[in-house]
């Protein structure tokens, strides 16, 4: 932030008597302002030339713990650390807003930056309390009455210009402080938002990590189950192979036995056929013998009947 440097009225010490005699000198103005008999809205007339209206709010200085009247010149003089803090905050803000890929590096950097911002805001608030701008600014301006003394009018006008310039600088300082507060609050909001986004991303990353770990465990379990199944299938295949070999051996043995049985069956068939043929011949012979015997018996019976009849 740019600071307007107040113009200071330099009074030479070569003419002390002229300053003491001149009621419009800056020293006389400061001396009369710091007198304890000053009251609110008190009007003093110096030689009928200048009308000065004083209306200053008395307050307590937190550094000296006593009542005092604030010198307006102190209002336009910012603390020595304030320009550095202003430059640091403006530089940080420009660095943050200028980089589109700004990301939160870590919770430690964010906490350090937030602590630095809070310290800067506390120092500015302390400087504001020490300055007491809201309580020590004059409520009424100096009004000048035109006189015939050219020197007094010129010096009074210089005092008015210096006072108005200092007051403008004080107002600019107030505006700059207000702008710095707004920038600080905006930066805090951005930091809080980034912290919130970081926490959300951390929770999401943790959730995805847990899901990936669970999926890995499930895949390992499925792989182990599949491996066990493959091993059992291999064992079953080996058993089936052994059984198939054994069955082939049994089949070969059965084939040999079947061939033997077929040979025996052929033998039995031929023997049965032979026996059947021999049986048929015996039956035919027996039938022929029986027929011959029956013929002999018939002939003997006829001969016996004839002999019986002849007797």
Curated annotation (Swiss-Prot):
The keyword Coiled coil applies. It is found in: Cytoplasm; Early endosome; Endosome; Recycling endosome. The keyword Nucleotidyltransferase does not apply. One of its GO terms (cellular component) is recycling endosome. GO terms for biological process: cell division; cell projection organization; positive regulation of cilium assembly; positive regulation of protein localization to cilium; regulation of cytokinesis. Keywords: Cell cycle, Cell division, Cell projection, Cilium biogenesis/degradation, Coiled coil, Cytoplasm, Cytoskeleton, Endosome. Residues 167-278 form a coiled coil. Signal peptide: none annotated. Its main location: cytoplasm. Belongs to the ENTR1 family. Endosome-associated protein that plays a role in membrane receptor sorting, cytokinesis and ciliogenesis. This is Endosome-associated-trafficking regulator 1.
């Amino acid at each position: 932030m740019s600071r307007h440097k107040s113009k200071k009225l330099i009074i030479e010490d070569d003419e002390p008597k002229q300053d003491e005699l001149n009621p419009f000198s800056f020293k006389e103005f400061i001396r009369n302002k710091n007198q304890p008999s000053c009251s609110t809205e008190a009007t003093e007339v110096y030689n009928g030339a200048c009308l000065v209206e004083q209306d200053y709010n008395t307050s307590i200085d937190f550094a000296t713990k006593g009542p005092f009247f604030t010198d307006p010149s102190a209002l336009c003089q910012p603390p020595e650390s304030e320009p550095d803090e202003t430059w640091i905050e403006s530089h940080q803000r420009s660095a943050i807003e200028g980089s589109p890929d700004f990301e939160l590096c870590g919770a430690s950097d964010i906490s350090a930056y937030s602590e630095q911002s809070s310290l800067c805001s506390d120092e500015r608030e302390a400087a504001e309390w020490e300055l007491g701008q809201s309580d020590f600014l004059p409520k009424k301006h100096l009004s000048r009455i035109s006189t015939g003394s050219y020197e007094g009018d010129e010096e009074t006008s210089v005092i008015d210009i210096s006072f108005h310039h200092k007051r403008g600088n004080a107002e600019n300082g107030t505006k700059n402080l207000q702008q710095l507060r707004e920038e600080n609050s905006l930066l805090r909001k951005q930091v809080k938002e980034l912290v919130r986004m970081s926490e959300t991303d951390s929770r999401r990353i943790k959730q995805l990590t847990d899901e990936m770990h669970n999926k890995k465990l499930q895949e390992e379990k499925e792989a182990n189950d599949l491996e066990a199944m493959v091993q059992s299938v291999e064992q079953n295949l080996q058993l089936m192979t052994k059984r198939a070999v054994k069955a082939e051996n049994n089949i070969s043995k059965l084939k040999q036995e079947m061939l033997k049985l077929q040979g025996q069956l052929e033998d039995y068939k031929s023997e049965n056929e032979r026996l059947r043929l021999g049986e048929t011949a015996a039956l035919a012979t027996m039938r022929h013998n029986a027929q011959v015997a029956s013929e002999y018996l018939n002939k003997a019976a006829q001969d016996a009947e004839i002999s019986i009849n002849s007797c």
